[in-house]
């Protein structure tokens, strides 16, 4: 899964994707412990995908907070300009 594809998804899609990936990770770990899985490298791949999705979510959260701060600052500047 490429990060640029993940980055373009909405927050709700990312949350749904995290749920799916964590469920898949649970099943892979379960199969690994019961010796039913032959391709153990898939666990690492899914873990990295979960990390990519969480990173994208955090990035969106930080950008949203910065936009909110910028809006508040602009409103304060306008209020101060009107007072003077």
Curated annotation (Swiss-Prot):
Signal peptide: none annotated. It comes from Mycoplasma mobile (strain ATCC 43663 / 163K / NCTC 11711). Belongs to the universal ribosomal protein uL29 family. Disulfide bonds: none annotated. This is Large ribosomal subunit protein uL29. One of its GO terms (cellular component) is cytosolic large ribosomal subunit. InterPro entries: Ribosomal_protein_uL29, Ribosomal_uL29, Ribosomal_uL29_sf. GO terms for molecular function: structural constituent of ribosome. It holds the Pfam family Ribosomal_L29. It comes from the Bacteria. Keywords: Ribonucleoprotein, Ribosomal protein. HAMAP family: Ribosomal_uL29 (MF_00374). GO terms for biological process: translation. Coiled coil: none annotated.
């Amino acid at each position: 899964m490429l990060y640029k594809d993940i980055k373009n998804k909405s927050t709700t899609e990312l949350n749904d994707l995290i749920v799916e990936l964590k469920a898949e990770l649970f099943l892979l770990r379960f199969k690994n412990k019961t010796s039913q899985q032959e391709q153990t490298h898939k666990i690492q791949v899914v873990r990295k995908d979960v990390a990519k999705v969480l990173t994208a979510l955090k990035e969106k959260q930080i950008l949203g907070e910065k936009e909110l701060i910028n809006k508040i600052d602009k409103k304060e500047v306008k209020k101060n300009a009107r007072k003077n």
